Amino acid sequence: MRHGDISSSNDCVGVAVVNYKMPRLHTKAEVLDNCRKIADMLVGMKRGLPGMDLVIFPEYSTHGIMYDAKEMYDTASAIPGEETEIFADACRRANVWGVFSLTGERHEEHPNKAPYNTLILMNNQGEIVQKYRKIMPWVPIEGWYPGDCTYVSEGPKGLKISLIICDDGNYPEIWRDCAMRGAELVVRCQGYMYPAKEQQIMVSKAMAFMNNCYVAVANAAGFDGVYSYFGHSAIIGFDGRTLGETGEEEMGIQYAELSKHLIRDARKNGQSQNHLFKLVHRGYTGTINSGDGDKGVAACPYNFYSQWVNDPEGTREMVESFTRTTVGTPECPIEGIPHEAPKHR
């Protein structure tokens, strides 16, 4: 794990993250024009960072947030499509991999169902290697149709990569799922705004440490007329320490070199903080001392997870018993979100 240079090597993957200024767009033509700006930025960045193997742009960087529902549906993209063609050309010209946001991707039943919030990982030949749909849209505000699966793909120089999006990262389950599928780098693209800056900086560092994985965060910056985005795009080591972090500046860039050997060595030889290994070898010191073998205990001890898998509806009812039974709340109603009738005291 190296930071401060502009290089890379056969072992180290050069990764850049961008504080892209949140655009405010309304038409397909404006979206495509913005795609060209992203493409030009990518090519320019490669001149300044010759070691750059992978560049990551934030959630909403392509389309911006369409606050008008008709505009959101009208500008929703097909994948592959015109937007990805522009990105593919840039990746080929710069010989760089890229992560790009498409908000939204047309649903299979478009326009009868809401679009997906989608990320793509594209290789340096302009081919889409991974397409990830946001599992946890930021309700109650975001109206995206939820995805249902994480992925791991071989990225530049063989580094194993998973993509997640913004609010996904507030749920430890998704990080663990990616890591247990073999991800060495979890890319978190976000369009996160104030007031949640401190929490979001903290959670990505904690999840890197807890899952023995690199984390690359690309966040939006600026003000789009509705929200103020805090930037702080960052690259985090698998020990939870920040290698590089931007401030709040629009179009700020950070860059670091991620060693494949170091993370693989740590996962193989780490002991007290090897969380992935220890989770399925629980208490092995105690079982050795007890004559019960040297593997520890593999069984999942967490009742909630087995209950959720085997009885999702029943588990939802259980959670509603100590939270609420409607998706909305009458004490802070949001248009279009059902809530129970207010109680008069």
UniProtKB/Swiss-Prot annotation:
<feature type="domain" description="CN hydrolase">
    <location>
        <begin position="13"/>
        <end position="260"/>
    </location>
</feature>
<dbReference type="GO" id="GO:0004040">
    <property type="term" value="F:amidase activity"/>
</dbReference>
<comment type="similarity">
    <text>Belongs to the carbon-nitrogen hydrolase superfamily. Aliphatic amidase family.</text>
</comment>
<dbReference type="InterPro" id="IPR023719">
    <property type="entry name" value="Aliphatic_amidase"/>
</dbReference>
<keyword id="KW-0378">Hydrolase</keyword>
<dbReference type="InterPro" id="IPR050345">
    <property type="entry name" value="Aliph_Amidase/BUP"/>
</dbReference>
<dbReference type="InterPro" id="IPR003010">
    <property type="entry name" value="C-N_Hydrolase"/>
</dbReference>
<comment type="function">
    <text>Also exhibits in vitro acyl transferase activity, transferring the acyl moiety of short-chain amides to hydroxylamine to form hydroxamates.</text>
</comment>
<dbReference type="Pfam" id="PF00795">
    <property type="entry name" value="CN_hydrolase"/>
</dbReference>
<comment type="function">
    <text>Catalyzes the hydrolysis of short-chain aliphatic amides to their corresponding organic acids with release of ammonia.</text>
</comment>
<feature type="active site" description="Proton donor">
    <location>
        <position position="134"/>
    </location>
</feature>
<protein>
    <recommendedName>
        <fullName>Aliphatic amidase</fullName>
        <ecNumber>3.5.1.4</ecNumber>
    </recommendedName>
</protein>
<dbReference type="InterPro" id="IPR036526">
    <property type="entry name" value="C-N_Hydrolase_sf"/>
</dbReference>
<feature type="active site" description="Nucleophile">
    <location>
        <position position="166"/>
    </location>
</feature>
<feature type="active site" description="Proton acceptor">
    <location>
        <position position="59"/>
    </location>
</feature>
